[in-house]
Swiss-Prot record:
<comment type="function">
    <text>Allows the formation of correctly charged Asn-tRNA(Asn) or Gln-tRNA(Gln) through the transamidation of misacylated Asp-tRNA(Asn) or Glu-tRNA(Gln) in organisms which lack either or both of asparaginyl-tRNA or glutaminyl-tRNA synthetases. The reaction takes place in the presence of glutamine and ATP through an activated phospho-Asp-tRNA(Asn) or phospho-Glu-tRNA(Gln).</text>
</comment>
<dbReference type="InterPro" id="IPR017959">
    <property type="entry name" value="Asn/Gln-tRNA_amidoTrfase_suB/E"/>
</dbReference>
<comment type="similarity">
    <text>Belongs to the GatB/GatE family. GatB subfamily.</text>
</comment>
<dbReference type="InterPro" id="IPR003789">
    <property type="entry name" value="Asn/Gln_tRNA_amidoTrase-B-like"/>
</dbReference>
<dbReference type="GO" id="GO:0070681">
    <property type="term" value="P:glutaminyl-tRNAGln biosynthesis via transamidation"/>
</dbReference>
<dbReference type="InterPro" id="IPR017958">
    <property type="entry name" value="Gln-tRNA_amidoTrfase_suB_CS"/>
</dbReference>
<keyword id="KW-0648">Protein biosynthesis</keyword>
<keyword id="KW-0436">Ligase</keyword>
<comment type="subunit">
    <text>Heterotrimer of A, B and C subunits.</text>
</comment>
<dbReference type="InterPro" id="IPR018027">
    <property type="entry name" value="Asn/Gln_amidotransferase"/>
</dbReference>
<dbReference type="GO" id="GO:0050566">
    <property type="term" value="F:asparaginyl-tRNA synthase (glutamine-hydrolyzing) activity"/>
</dbReference>
<dbReference type="InterPro" id="IPR004413">
    <property type="entry name" value="GatB"/>
</dbReference>
<keyword id="KW-0067">ATP-binding</keyword>
<dbReference type="InterPro" id="IPR023168">
    <property type="entry name" value="GatB_Yqey_C_2"/>
</dbReference>
<dbReference type="InterPro" id="IPR006075">
    <property type="entry name" value="Asn/Gln-tRNA_Trfase_suB/E_cat"/>
</dbReference>
<keyword id="KW-0547">Nucleotide-binding</keyword>
<dbReference type="InterPro" id="IPR042114">
    <property type="entry name" value="GatB_C_1"/>
</dbReference>
Length: 477
């Protein structure tokens, strides 16, 4: 029997505001526990919430970027449930009237095709605090610094049919919120986290299967593993004659499996009702147009421009526009190296990315600036150094040994381009290797590489490879 996987994702993006959604308390990460929780966050009597305008602006910005309808009137509701890190006994969220309506996001599949994933809604809500179970023996501690931090919950349609599609959607969404500068996307710190709703059904049927919700998955790799495990688990149950239970599950990355957390609640379990302390949110057209004017060039637009303007392949353009910072760095390199777009792409995706990954740095933390890398690429183009020597120059620059010109001068790496000097070295190599010379002239063409290698070795890699090839061809005839 063939089964079809059905996946919908709920993503919580922590908005990059300086203060909380309903109070003036700071949202800075890493402060001492409970040092950033004010009377409103603590749920003390007699205090009233005041909506953060910047959080609304960021939500509208996201809605415009996904081509969604912005609700002129939305309502905040109380979502009632008990949890130790929820001081009020309810969470302020949105239910029937969210700020952002239907939208969509286009993802690329592995075969190069594209697929549109529907976005049902995006609504504003406050985050809860944090329960700390490992720091206290036999007890749990509560840190309310995170309570009241603004979240944008982005709910997709159940349009994904594999774990890989879900990861592609999640990565696209992650890049988008970072491009918009509404969320820093830091998954380790919980700024961007995902709940996956997973079910299976017989292929060809319209009715959805019973879904399980996997909570708070905080890496792309874990999302793929958690979904794949859950799909196999549900298929095993159904093929064994059992029934899948609707429940909330947690993914255990150490064991690579999901485990039951609690039975899945329905909306009526939360007893939603409009928050009497908050007026309905009215958004007029002028506010929306003002936000529209702040939209940056979006990832798909930038990718298309890189392909048409710089002549890059779809793959290269996709890699270079994966983050706003990467795209900006690349364009600065192209400008600094005189417009050699393909050479710049190769170096940014190659040596630079490898060095960043090795040192676990973001591109904004690169010790080699875009201008400095561009200057080095110019030295390749004007034949001052070869591409091979450039790798040594780049390593020295990365280690703080100065600019490309300074490193080339200090280490004596300038390429030998004097024809007479190269010819003299070729003559010596030929004289030192009479056996190989005779074999080459007898038709053993593969030995050409041997002679190139000997010349490059004799010059310490500093001879111009193109000149060496041309001169050797003439000399070896």
């Amino acid at each position: 029997m063939e089964w079809e996987t059905v996946i919908g994702l709920e993503v919580h993006a922590q908005l990059a505001t300086k203060s909380k959604i309903f109070s003036g308390a700071s949202t800075a990460y890493g402060a001492a526990p409970n040092s950033q929780a004010c009377a409103i966050d603590l749920g003390l009597p007699g205090v009233l919430p005041v909506l953060n305008r910047e959080a609304v602006r960021m939500a509208v910005k996201f809605g415009l970027a996904i081509g969604a309808e912005i609700s002129p009137r939305s309502v905040f509701a109380r979502k009632n449930y008990f949890y130790p890190d929820l001081p009020k006994g309810y969470q302020i969220s949105q239910y029937e009237l969210p700020v952002v309506g239907l939208g969509k996001l286009e993802i690329e599949l592995e075969d190069g095709e594209t697929k549109v994933i529907g976005i049902t809604r995006a609504h504003l809500e406050e985050d809860a605090g944090k329960s700390l179970h490992e720091d206290f023996h036999g007890m749990s501690g509560i840190d309310l610094n995170r309570a009241g931090t603004p979240l944008l919950e982005i709910v997709s349609e159940p349009d994904m049919r594999s774990a890989k599609e879900a990861v592609a959607y999640l990565k696209k969404l992650h890049a988008l919120v970072r491009y918009l500068e509404i969320c820093d996307g830091n998954m380790q710190e919980g700024s961007f986290r995902c709940d996956a709703n997973v079910s299976v059904r017989r292929k060809g049927t319209e009715k959805f299967g019973t879904r399980a919700e996997i909570k708070n998955i905080n890496s792309f790799r874990f999302v793929e593993r958690a979904i794949n495990y859950e799909v196999e688990r549900q298929i095993d149950i159904l093929e064994g004659g059992g029934a899948v239970v609707q429940e909330t599950r947690l993914y255990d990355p150490d064991k690579g499996e999901t485990r039951s957390m609690r039975s899945k609640e329905e909306a009526n379990d939360y007893r939603y009702f409009p928050d009497p302390d908050l007026l309905p949110l009215e958004i007029d057209a002028s506010f929306i147009e003002g936000v529209r004017g702040t939209l940056p060039e979006l990832p798909d637009e930038k990718k298309h421009r890189f392909m048409t303007h710089y002549g890059l392949s779809a793959y290269d353009a996709g890699v270079l526009t994966a983050s706003r910072e990467m795209g900006d760095y690349y364009e600065a390199v192209v400008k600094a190296c005189g417009g050699h777009a393909k050479l710049a792409a190769n170096w940014v995706m190659g040596e630079l990315s490898a060095a960043l990954n090795k040192d676990n740095r973001e591109i904004t933390e690169s010790p080699v600036s875009a201008a400095a890398l561009g200057q080095m690429l110019e030295r390749i183009e004007d034949n001052t150094i070869s591409g091979k020597i450039a790798k040594d120059v780049f390593e020295a620059m990365w280690n703080g040994e100065g600019s490309a010109d300074a490193v080339i001068e200090k280490k004596g790496l300038k390429q030998i381009t004097d024809t007479g000097a190269i010819e003299a070295i070729i003559d010596k190599v030929m004289a030192d290797n009479p056996g190989q010379l005779e074999q080459y002239r007898s038709g053993k063409d593969k030995l050409f590489g041997f002679f190139v290698g000997q010349v490059m070795k004799a010059t310490g890699g500093k001879a111009n490879p193109g000149q060496v090839n041309d001169l050797l061809k003439k000399k070896l005839q």
